[in-house]
Structure formats: structure tokens, C-alpha cells
Amino acid sequence: KDFIPNKIEFLQSMTAAIIGEKQMTPVYISLIDRVGRLMYAQYEERLEKAKVDDSCLNPEMPTYTDFYDLMKAQEEQEAKAMAVAMEIYVNGTNNFFAKQSNVDLNNRFIVYETRDLPATMKSLSMQVILESTWQRVITNFKKGRRTYIWIDEFHMFLSSKFGREYIKKFIKRCRKYNGIVTL
């Protein structure tokens, strides 16, 4: 039931890291909410269609590229400005997280190495990694398993309001779903 609100909160946090926290006006936050709801509604429609068609293929989760395309299609000037700011992270040199992940999430022990990422990508990468980790926590919870999470470089989340809120909620959610977080 919290799937879409949690995903939209992640999009807000990720976009704040990209465009700057001071740019996150109520209009920007509302646009992110609208586009996020639209994007995940389309995803849920694809899921339902896959069930009806008896398809064994699950639709892929939306990517930041999908979010960017929908944002760019909005009529408001603020949406156009946000899309321009996001462009480097979708089509440009910082497009590390714009596509489906190449990390094998079926391993029991997963390490995300961020050492070689540009400094401008560190905060954003930590948020993307936590979102991926959260999906694993949910999967393990459904199987009755605990998930142990070690977060190095925790201080990176403390540099912005959205980062602080995201990590706080992440830790609280993990505890409710048998996640054990060590900082």
C-alpha cells in the first residue's frame, strides 16, 4: 500500500540531490508527485496486463529515464527546467543510474562500490543503493528472512534535508521489516 508514496519520496530525494535542495519548491515537489504517480500507474497497468495475458515476463520497473521522459512531456515551465537539470543524469556523462541495474541482486552478499564515482554522484548513488537495498529487505521479509545492512559513508546522507529524511525513514522501515542496519 505504501509502494507508490515510497517511490515518489525516493524520486523527490533523488531529484533534490540532482537539482539542489533550494530549488525544491512546492511546485517542483508537486510536479515530481504527479509524474511519479503517472509513471507508477503505467507500471501497475503493465503488471496487470502481464497477469491477464498469463505472461511469464514481469514488466521491468520504471527507470529514471522513464521519469525524465514524462517530466519533459509536462507543460509547466518548471517541469521543463527540471528536465534540463536531469538531462546529464539521463543522457549525459552522469547517466550511471538511468537504466536497469546490472547488479546481480540474487547473491546473498552484495557490495556496492562507489569509490570510482565522481564526487558529484556520491550522494545520489547512496540514495539509489538504499532504494535497491530496500527492495531486497521487502523480498527477504516476505520469505521470513532478516536482512543485515552495513552503511559506510553515512555522513553523506546528512548533507541535505531530503537525504536526512530519506535515511531516517529507510532505517525506520527496515526495522519494521526485519532489517538490521549498522552505521
Predicted segments with their positions:
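P-loop NTPase motor domains
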Residues: K1-G179
